[in-house]
């Protein structure tokens, strides 16, 4: 039987203590760390960018499951890959060419994810 993987989000973490929060998740059995990236444009909220993700790498070797809620997403994929994302999830609505963006993620040796909005036509 396949093992279920746990990927808790750091969105509700204390952003002034992210290193400690990630250590707590790791000690609690997390398999991955889910990072919600929001730009205040594609979605109304604003969170973190590549420099923060890069700075968190020193606290864990767990997979960073980075969910990009930004537009235009294609422009920033490499920045997040270089910062330490292992899995990059994007929204079709945030890119002009979904296949091209997914191919870019794969070319950077990262796993890909697509987040679907049921209301999108």
Feature map (PLM): residue ranges:
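Conserved N-terminal beta1-alpha1 strand-loop-helix module at the mouth
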Residues: 1-89, 93-97, 104-110
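Anionic-ligand binding region
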Residues: 102-114, 118-121
């Amino acid at each position: 039987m396949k093992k279920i993987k746990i990927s808790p989000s750091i969105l509700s973490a204390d952003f002034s203590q992210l290193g400690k929060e990630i250590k707590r998740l790791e000690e609690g059995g997390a398999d991955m760390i889910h990072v919600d990236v929001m730009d205040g444009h594609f979605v109304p909220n604003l969170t973190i960018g590549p420099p923060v993700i890069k700075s968190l790498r020193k606290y864990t070797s767990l997979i960073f499951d980075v969910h990009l809620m930004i537009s235009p997403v294609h422009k920033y994929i490499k920045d997040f890959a270089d910062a330490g994302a292992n899995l990059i999830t994007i929204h079709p609505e945030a890119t002009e060419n979904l296949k091209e963006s997914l191919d870019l993620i794969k070319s950077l040796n990262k796993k890909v994810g697509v987040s679907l909005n049921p209301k999108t036509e």
